[in-house]
UniProtKB/Swiss-Prot annotation:
It is found in: Cytoplasm. PROSITE patterns: U_DNA_GLYCOSYLASE (PS00130). SMART domains: UDG, UreE_C. The gene is ung. This is Uracil-DNA glycosylase. Belongs to the uracil-DNA glycosylase (UDG) superfamily. UNG family. InterPro entries: UDG_fam1, Ura-DNA_Glyclase_AS, Uracil-DNA_glycosylase-like, Uracil-DNA_glycosylase-like_sf. It comes from Mycoplasmopsis pulmonis (strain UAB CTIP) (Mycoplasma pulmonis). Excises uracil residues from the DNA which can arise as a result of misincorporation of dUMP residues by DNA polymerase or due to deamination of cytosine. The keyword DNA damage applies. The active site is at D64 (proton acceptor). Its main location: cytoplasm. The keyword Hydrolase applies. Pfam families: UDG.
Amino acid sequence: MNKEQRWKSFFEKEKAQKYFKDELWPFLENEYKNKIIFPKKEDIFKAFDLVDFNNLKVVIIGQDPYINENQAHGLAFSTLDFLLPKSLKNIFIELKNNYPNVVLKSGNLTSWASQGILLLNRVLSVEKGLSSSHYNRGWEIFTFNVIDYISKNFENIIFVLWGKKAQDLKKDINFKNHFILESSHPSPFSANISFFGSQIFLKINKILEQINKEKINWNIE
């Protein structure tokens, strides 16, 4: 089996685990039935659907989805809305500082995912208007197991850890086989600590060049 096939096998086994099928998924079924939950149910695992795991290069870890209408669609930090959420606005500020000529016509990061960037939130769902409402329901176990699987079954992946919730996973990543880039979270509350000026996007492409992988085209046409 290639990496994509092995990943799908792991993914199906994970969804059969007791915490997932007996706790997390019944909770989500009830939430989607009775409340407004983001992203749409069919988009929960879009971050995995859009990445070819034979070409996985980068894992960027977020927190939980955006809480307003027409924003979250299954990719961490990405949005369908024309108006950019503040964290994404700061991401684009840093990106433009790294690459002044970058073209950013929307906040939809699908083109990044298609180049091998897994945009993974720590928690994959949220109730409308209520940040962190789906923490401690099982998503943390799931995303921990995903990161653990990638760490053990892939090589030379660049893990981008923005903020404490992402950095909590640092101890579970094999330093010898992977690269770790970290800074404060790009939210307005913490971007000035170490996110701005981190040159994260330049660093990602410099590493990819060093390991003979195709660099990321950051343009969003």
